[in-house]
């Protein structure tokens, strides 16, 4: 009987320990994983909506600039660089998930035309490899090699990101043509304000959920605040929880209104999107253009020679 009780107690303790560890993992892991741009693909088949808006803007609410530079034209089956610049003030610090201040990270999504894709390592020149460094690029989906995602990576080191791109060859891909194609880019700096599941991060403004008077504000042991608002109309108490990070703006006894900001806006980052155009050039057209230019130059040379010959004939006739 005692042995059975001992086994039962051990079983309960093991189950309880596993449950606690699982809860700790879920609580601590979720905010970190959701911060990666690649996790945005869980809710969107395509990162660019029909309106042209890139879905990263759903989580990164502030509007910031981004720039992309690509060659004007490129030949088939050629590796070229798409340089994405994500500028921001290197001196600013962002609010981390634990409420402390830290350096900003950056991320980007590059939407290429169908057929264009990330260049394989064996096609990269030493110069491009040096520019890429230790960056690790990923496809938005295994079936969408033309959409490339990177980040988050340290912003101080990678505010300029070089994407090595391989152009397609219409000779081997029938759905690719020698045309002018658009390229779209989205770039983030800093953490988002909304997680992909719709919940707010601590990198956000927190507003009052009721109109009334701030009756009590309690600073939590691990950071953040618990704000008690007493509704003046019915005396009902409403408690607003402020996570670590945002700076509290209200004090006890202060009258506030519904949706009034309780905290400052800690966000120093944001998202921007841009576009560029690139021409997939037919080598035969280039050769034809070169031959045409060469023929014009030769024609000019022959014209000059003919003119000089004519002048000599005229001069000789005048001497007679």
Swiss-Prot record:
Keyword tags: Chloroplast, Electron transport, Heme, Iron, Membrane, Metal-binding, Photosynthesis, Plastid, Signal, Thylakoid, Transmembrane, Transmembrane helix, Transport
Cofactor note: Binds 1 heme group covalently.
SUPFAM superfamilies to which the protein is assigned, alphabetical: Cytochrome f subunit of the cytochrome b6f complex, transmembrane anchor, Cytochrome f, large domain, Rudiment single hybrid motif
Family: Belongs to the cytochrome f family.
Disulfide bonds: none
PROSITE patterns from the UniProt entry: CYTF
Task of the protein: Component of the cytochrome b6-f complex, which mediates electron transfer between photosystem II (PSII) and photosystem I (PSI), cyclic electron flow around PSI, and state transitions.
InterPro entries attached to this UniProt entry: Cyt-f_TM, Cyt_f, Cyt_f_lg_dom, Cyt_f_lg_dom_sf, Rudment_hybrid_motif
GO biological process, one term: photosynthesis
Listed name of the protein: Cytochrome f
Cofactor: heme
Gene3D superfamilies per UniProt: 2.40.50.100, Cytochrome f large domain (2.60.40.830), Single helix bin (1.20.5.700)
GO molecular function: electron transfer activity; heme binding; iron ion binding
Signal peptide (from-to): 1-35
